[in-house]
């Protein structure tokens, strides 16, 4: 009951602060948490009110950590157990140091960095979409609740789970690649919920930029790389070379061409350079998210 109330409270807070939808009921069979005395002995998990359950351990529990709770999750491929472990220790947060990069997220290209790296949008779902649509057409001809209907539903769920696993693996590999040889990473403070409701919502959800930035922040903390978010406004409308406001660009314009200093650069790379400049300026003045000054002068570009 306590866990359910915590989830409900978090759902209402997310609705108010992040613009998410009204909380919906979730099937009990999808996941549930267990508190109390939990221990792992060999290939078995011991939990309150339940028998010893055999499981396949993905990794050893680090020495000194205590198991606080366990989350049982039902997926198409089987049941999974997430162990929440705790250790009373002071975690040192990474400090700004070394080489800095800015990262701009987009639709046509997933990310562009201030070092010139531009990655096209990965199409995780598109590759499996033909199989999914074929199975969904077959599903329409089956009686709901029948064995054939359940079997087809299970096959569709397996395909969606495989797509999600590929997406997550790609995000982790990319995050590690970006952190190599870098001391600071800056990204925009974007509300990706609004992206998912826009014209390119399907592409946005397929890329999973919100998940990627969360994973990137986690990997940065593990690899001693400083991570911070900056103000997202006007990053594509400022020249990173001279700071001139160049005006709003149509999405079809893919090249930044400054009329004042003649600086020419890929539009997304130029935006990532502005993001990097804002991040470095925020460090200099001791803030995390830069705002537009009240006098109307746009912040985030070096003069």
Regions found by a protein language model. Give the residues of each.
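Short acidic-glycine loop/turn motifs at beta-strand connectors
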Residues: 41, 75-76, 114-117, 242, ...
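Positively charged, low-complexity nucleic-acid-binding target-recognition regions
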Residues: 92, 203, 207-303
């Amino acid at each position: 009951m306590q866990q359910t109330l915590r989830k409900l409270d978090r759902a209402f807070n997310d609705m108010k602060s992040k613009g998410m939808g009204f909380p919906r009921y979730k099937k009990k069979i999808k996941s549930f948490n267990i508190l109390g005395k939990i221990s792992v002995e060999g290939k078995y998990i011991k939990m309150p009110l339940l028998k010893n359950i055999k499981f396949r351990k993905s990794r050893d529990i680090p020495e000194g950590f205590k198991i606080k709770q366990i989350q049982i999750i039902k997926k198409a491929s089987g049941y999974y157990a997430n162990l929440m472990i705790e250790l009373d220790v002071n975690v040192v947060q990474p400090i700004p140091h070394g080489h800095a990069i800015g990262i701009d997220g987009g639709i046509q290209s997933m990310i562009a960095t201030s070092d010139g790296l531009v990655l096209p949008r990965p199409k995780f779902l598109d590759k499996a979409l033909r199989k999914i649509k074929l199975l969904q057409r077959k599903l329409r001809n089956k009686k709901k609740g029948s064995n054939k209907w359940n079997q087809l539903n299970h096959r569709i769920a397996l395909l969606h789970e495989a797509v999600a696993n590929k997406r997550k693996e790609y995000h982790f590999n990319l995050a590690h690649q970006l952190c190599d040889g870098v001391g600071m990473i800056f990204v925009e403070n974007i509300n990706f919920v609004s992206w998912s409701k826009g014209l390119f919502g399907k592409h946005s959800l397929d890329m999973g930029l919100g998940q990627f930035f969360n994973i990137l922040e986690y990997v940065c903390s593990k690899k001693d790389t400083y991570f911070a978010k900056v103000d997202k406004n006007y990053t594509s409308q400022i020249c990173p070379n001279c700071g001139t406001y160049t005006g709003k660009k149509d999405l079809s314009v893919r090249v930044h061409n400054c009329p004042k200093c003649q600086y020419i650069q890929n539009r997304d790379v130029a935006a990532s350079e502005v993001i990097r400049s804002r991040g470095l300026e925020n460090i200099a003045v001791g803030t995390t998210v830069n705002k537009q000054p009240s006098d109307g002068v746009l912040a985030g570009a070096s003069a």
